[in-house]
Amino acid sequence: MTARRKRPFVLVVEDDASLGEVVVQAFRDEGLDARLARDGDEAMRVVDELAPAAIVLDLMMPRRDGFSVLRELRSDGRIARIPVVVVTAIFGLSERMYATELGAADYVTKPFELDDLVSRVRALVASHKAA
């Protein structure tokens, strides 16, 4: 992790490109830096390279799901404290509990309000920065 940024950087991990770009643009519109990763492997490369202040993580992705990404994030001491907001169409209590056990800071179900997501991520970034 080498990058230093003036504005907080949010990594959006979403395999649906159109939704991902809308979310990225919402963060940019609110003065945050944001980038889209389309799968879990790309997400881990970006995390290692750019050190995001927060991650918005879809659970249901091809090849490597969000649970796997979350497990890897939490197992690496260099990046284990990055706040992760899980965003998913999965409404089940067991999935929500599992994501929380793996270290998700928040869990948002689709469809969601962009303003609400941005607000939640901003709050996590601020509290993480203060810690």
Located regions from the model:
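Short amphipathic alpha-helix used as the core "switch/output" element in two-component signaling
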Residues: 45, 67-80
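Acidic catalytic/metal-coordinating carboxylates
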Residues: 39-42, 53, 65-71, 91, ...
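Alpha4 helix (beta4-alpha4-beta5 surface) of REC/receiver domains from two-component response regulators
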Residues: 24, 68, 91-108
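The feature encodes the CheY-like receiver
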Residues: 20, 61-63, 80, 92
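Two-component/phosphorelay signaling modules centered on CheY-like receiver
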Residues: 16-35, 124
